[in-house]
């Protein structure tokens, strides 16, 4: 996953809509869904979708008459990528460790339990992904 930036409010609303659908959506479909909650121009939604496509967050599918858009990554994968990118901003391992400690101090009991389970699976060798920042073979 490429380096990510935090999503703006409208980008997040567009992504939330796309994640809630099983089929790729046209600009019109996204516009109609979002316009029910806020006043938006069709061209604004189109621009946001095009920018999300340039960021490789949505896939632009060309149909006969309209473009359809689908998320490239699931919500969980995108959020995890944002967290890894934020952690990578630390200059050294000591700073990364301190950032992790501050993060863990702020999570709730359910999230802490999920972290414990994930770490236990990773230590048991059942993790399905390399640790963040680990080199991968190409």
From Swiss-Prot:
Induction: Autoregulated. Up-regulated by amoxicillin.
Alphabetized Pfam families for the sequence: Penicillinase_R (PF03965)
Entries under InterPro entries matching the protein: BlaI_family, WH-like_DNA-bd_sf, WH_DNA-bd_sf
GO cellular component, one term: cytoplasm
Region called Important for dimerization, residue ranges: 74-138
Any one GO biological process: regulation of DNA-templated transcription
Post-translational modification: Upon exposure to beta-lactams, proteolytic cleavage at a single site may impair dimerization and abolish repressor activity.
Keyword NAD: no
Entry keywords, A to Z: Antibiotic resistance, Cytoplasm, DNA-binding, Repressor, Transcription, Transcription regulation
Residues flagged as site, Cleavage: 102-103
Keyword field contains Transferase: no
GO molecular function, one term: DNA binding
Main location: cytoplasm
Annotated DNA-binding residue span(s): 6-71
Family that this chain belongs to: Belongs to the BlaI transcriptional regulatory family.
Protein name: Transcriptional regulator BlaI
Organism: Mycobacterium tuberculosis (strain ATCC 25618 / H37Rv)
Taxonomic lineage: Bacteria, Bacillati, Actinomycetota, Actinomycetes, Mycobacteriales
């Amino acid at each position: 996953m490429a380096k990510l930036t935090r999503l703006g409010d409208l980008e997040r609303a567009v992504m939330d809509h796309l994640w809630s659908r099983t089929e790729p959506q046209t600009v019109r479909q996204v516009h109609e869904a979002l316009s029910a909650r806020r006043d938006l121009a069709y061209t604004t939604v189109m621009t946001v979708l095009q920018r999300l496509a340039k960021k490789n967050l949505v896939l632009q599918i060309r149909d006969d008459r309209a473009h359809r858009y689908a998320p490239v990554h699931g919500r969980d994968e995108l959020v995890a990528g944002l967290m890894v990118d934020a952690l990578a901003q630390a200059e050294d391992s000591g700073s990364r460790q301190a950032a992790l400690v501050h993060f863990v101090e702020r999570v709730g009991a359910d999230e802490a339990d999920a972290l414990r389970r994930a770490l236990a699976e990773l230590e048991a060798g059942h993790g399905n992904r390399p640790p963040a920042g680990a080199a991968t073979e190409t």
